[in-house]
Swiss-Prot record:
Gene Ontology terms describing biological process: L-tryptophan biosynthetic process
HAMAP family: TrpD
Gene Ontology CC: cytosol
Record's catalysed reaction(s): N-(5-phospho-beta-D-ribosyl)anthranilate + diphosphate = 5-phospho-alpha-D-ribose 1-diphosphate + anthranilate
Keywords, comma-separated and alphabetical: Amino-acid biosynthesis, Aromatic amino acid biosynthesis, Glycosyltransferase, Magnesium, Metal-binding, Transferase, Tryptophan biosynthesis
Family indicated by similarity: Belongs to the anthranilate phosphoribosyltransferase family.
Protein known as: Anthranilate phosphoribosyltransferase
Enzyme Commission code(s) on record: 2.4.2.18
Native organism taxonomy: Bacteria, Bacillati, Bacillota, Bacilli, Bacillales
Subunit structure: Homodimer.
Gene: trpD
This protein's record includes keyword Ribosomal protein: no
Domain of life: Bacteria
Binding site for anthranilate 1: 78, 109
Length: 331
């Protein structure tokens, strides 16, 4: 039975199968249509937790056998792929969280399945992404670093045209946030695919995160949203996985539909972010940033609850600290 047949028949894959899957995707001698069919088939397969951890560890260990570490560093990002066309929520959140003194290493990419990826909006903001050898100094000076996935993992460039041709989320949407080149202490990760939450949570535990939260937003978004019950998986190195749901109203924020969070081009999304960070926007767009920043501040042990995290995020914006962080970055 070929690898493609095994995948199409939803078989569990061995370590050898996983190696073959990766080698095939990155082999320049194999035709693109073969890779597209293989990646499509794997994306439709019920992926085992072992398979996810194998893929993540393969990319990290192949590229960073001595993975760098920065004390108490956090990443806040989503998988993308939720087709919501929301503005760049997690990028905006990164400025708020960093303004609280949490070292943030945000690992992002250009748009694959949306109008504006994190590096697209950063380019509009005139904020450069950092090379790997610049990150530690950047964190020491500014407390916030942005890394482009195609810089930290150049091999990923080979897959960009294939992923764009598929035009729907693939396994690499799930892998991207998990392969931050730095060994993180804390992580908040939004996930568009609810069925993978438990697998990803266990993989984060395998990667040694001290604390992390996974979010499947109400109505399918890869961020915590204001439109109903957000599914939360809380990861801790000290206890078992904890699953619960969270509504915006429980932390003092108003209900709002997901379509009120729609963004647009990188230029539009830059302006939305600036309006929020400067304190001039008091719409649901601000509230969704407060919610996600509140979750991140809770994970980073800055506050004792998500509700307190939301209050802290309000303070950081309303006192100008979040905007000061943005200006510090050269935006």
């Amino acid at each position: 039975m070929t690898l493609l047949e095994k995948i199409k028949q939803n078989k569990s894959l061995s370590k050898k199968d996983m190696q073959s899957f990766i080698v095939t995707l990155f082999d320049s001698n194999i035709e693109t249509n073969v890779k597209v069919e293989l990646l499509k088939a794997y994306t439709n397969k019920d992926m085992g937790q072992y398979e996810l951890t194998y893929l993540v560890e393969y990319f990290i260990q192949t590229n960073y056998p001595n993975q760098p570490f920065y004390n108490k560093a956090m990443c806040v990002c989503g998988t993308g792929g939720d087709q919501s066309n929301s503005f760049n929520i997690s990028t905006t959140v990164a400025f708020v969280v960093a303004s609280a003194g949490v070292p943030v290493i945000k690992h992002g990419n250009k748009s694959i399945t949306s109008h504006s990826g994190s590096t697209d909006v950063l380019h509009e903001m005139n904020i450069k992404t950092n090379k790997m050898n610049e990150v530690e100094q950047q964190l020491n000076l500014k407390g916030l670093a942005f890394i482009s996935a195609t810089d930290s993992y150049p091999m990923m460039k080979k897959l960009q045209s294939i992923r764009k041709s598929i035009a729907t989320p693939t396994i690499f949407n799930l892998i991207g946030p998990l392969i931050n080149p730095f060994k993180l202490t804390y992580q908040v990760m939004g996930v568009y695919e609810a069925s993978q939450l438990e697998n990803i949570a266990q993989t984060l535990k395998d990667l040694g995160r001290k604390r992390a939260i996974l979010i499947h937003g109400a109505n399918g978004m890869d961020e915590a949203t204001l439109s109903g019950e957000n599914i939360i998986y809380e990861v801790s190195s000290e206890r078992a996985l904890k699953k619960y749901s969270l509504k915006a109203e429980e932390v003092g924020l108003a209900y709002a539909n997901n379509d009120t969070l729609i963004g647009g081009s990188p230029q539009t999304n830059k302006q939305i972010a600036l309006n929020i960070l400067s304190g001039t926007d008091h719409s649901s767009k601000r509230d969704v940033v407060l919610l996600n920043a509140g979750i991140a501040l809770y994970v980073a042990e800055q506050v004792e609850s998500i509700k307190h995290g939301v209050e802290r995020a309000k303070y950081l914006i309303d006192t100008g600290m979040a905007m000061k962080q943005y200006l510090k970055m050269g935006g």
